[in-house]
Amino acid sequence: MEIKDKNNKTQFFVTSTRKRNYTNLIKSAQRLKNEKFNFEIIVIGRNKVFNISSVPKDIKDIFIFKGQVTYSKLYEIIENSDYIIITLTPESKYDNLFRKTRVTGSAQLSYGFLKPCIIDREFAYFYNFNDKNSLIYNDLNLYNAMKKAILLNNNEYNNLRNNILLITKKIYSISIMNIQKLIPEIKHYNFSNAPPNLLENHPLIY
C-alpha cells in the first residue's frame, strides 16, 4: 500500500455505533472549530445512534454523515481519510469488553489501511497502539489528540503510518503461526455440517 501525505483539510473517520458516547467528540470538534482549524469528521454507521441532529448547529458543517454504506464504499472513505477516531471510553462497562474479550472493527481498519488511530490510553495497549504509531489521550482529553493530529507535518504523519505497518506484519506472523497450529484439527473437521453462508445474496454493509 502506498504511503500518501495527509490531506490539506484533515479528515477524521469515526463510526456511529450502539452504546457509544459522542459528547467528548462533539465538544472537541467545537473547540477546534472555534480555534479555526481546518478539518472535517466523516461518520459511518447507523444514523439512529449518532446523526446530524446530535450535533450543535454551529459545527454541523464539519460533520459528514454517510449512514450505512457498502464495504467497497467504506474502504474508499477510509483510504481518503487521515485518522480513525476510536470512541471507546474506560468509564463504560460495555466499552471495557473491547480491551479484554472483543475487538473493535475500527482497529482492524487501522491495521488494514495504515491509518493512525486516536484512542484512549486505557485501550491502546490491547491493540498494540502507542505514541509511535497513533495519537493516545487520557482523561477524556480528545481535543489535544485531535489538535496534534491536525498539526502533524507529512513526515511525522508518515512515520506513524510506517510504524503501523510494523504492527500489521507482527499480527500477520502471529496469525500464520496460530493457523499452522490448528491445521491438524482443521483436517479432521467435517465441513458438511457447517452452517450456510448467511450473508449470501445480501449486500455487505457497515
Language model regions located:
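Nucleotide-sugar-dependent
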Residues: I86-Q108, G112, D120-N128
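Conserved catalytic-core segment of nucleotide-activated headgroup transferases in glycan assembly
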Residues: M1-P56, F65-S72
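Structural motif corresponding to alpha-helix initiation and N-cap regions
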Residues: Q68-S72, T104, D139-L140
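Short, aromatic/basic amphipathic alpha-helical patches
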Residues: I52-K60, N128-D131
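A short acidic/histidine/glycine-rich donor-binding loop in glycosyltransferase catalytic cores
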Residues: P116, Y125-N138
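A charged, aromatic-enriched C-terminal amphipathic alpha-helix characteristic of glycosyltransferases
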Residues: Y137-K147, L151-H202
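Short acidic active-site motifs
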Residues: N51, S72-L74, N141, A145
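Short acidic alpha-helix that forms the nucleotide-activated donor recognition element
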Residues: T70-Y83, K93, G112
